[in-house]
């Protein structure tokens, strides 16, 4: 089975929950933790990893707190000899049965870059209210890279939490310092994934992702980031154009036109409404023509129906995750003293130095 790569920073408590989940539900999983935490968190990480040493194979790679995030990931990827890697996070929980399906599929289909299931997002708010939403994933198997990119842009989704070819991940993170922009990164990563190769989606859940009001995240200060950081948005247009030339065989002029259309679509989603919030979306071809996405929504709705196969399959997992999420909020010292969010990695590093 492919190794799970988990970059982590100042969250030993959250990581303990994820590793505990893997130890309980998927013993013998192989995990690499790329730890870039501050010194005061080191002991917590050592204790966390020691707690699962008899059940999981965990390689703990420790980096200086100022060592850049994407460089940590690259260093860890370069230590792996396997063809396929599962990307994870210290607050997200993979469904390994879906990851195993993805691994088997990619081994037989070299023209696909990544494989994934849907994502169930849990968000714990300050009032202790828990919200849940579905993050869909679509099959993008058209032989034309330009078509895959255009279809993706209509109804984009996260492609990070998946099983992916290691060489493709290395390319992703080698250029990540150029492509990272809050509110745009998942979009640009997804376009790169579906331009460089095809995407495989399964109707089953691939990941349970969590957000905790006590944690610190990278996100835009406001929805007008595309105006405040317009130069960076234009840089993304050029990067997408180059991908369409290199992977899609388009001319420079045609690739530029397409990349402008792609970025305009992303901005329209930020400025107005996400596709699934637009009235009548459920009858739009973007949704209706994807049987996989419709199955994912049915599975998601089934989680809330007693006796539904989806609920029976995932109930123990969900109860564990929700319990850990609430426990972290009441007891954790993860990200202690940090802002709720930072717009850039530079701001995050400066904040550390200020302590």
Model-derived features: positions:
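Short, flexible, basic/aromatic active-site loop/helix in glycosyltransferases
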Residues: 134-154
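Glycine-rich, basic loop-to-helix element that forms the pyrophosphate-binding segment
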Residues: 63-80
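Short, acidic, metal-binding catalytic loop of nucleotide-sugar glycosyltransferases
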Residues: 20-29
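A short, conserved alpha-helix in the catalytic core of glycosyltransferases
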Residues: 168-172, 180-203
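Active-site donor/metal-binding and catalytic loop motifs
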Residues: 120, 126-128, 160, 196, ...
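A conserved acidic beta->alpha catalytic loop
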Residues: 34-48
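Conserved donor NDP-sugar-binding/catalytic core segment of glycosyltransferases
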Residues: 99-131
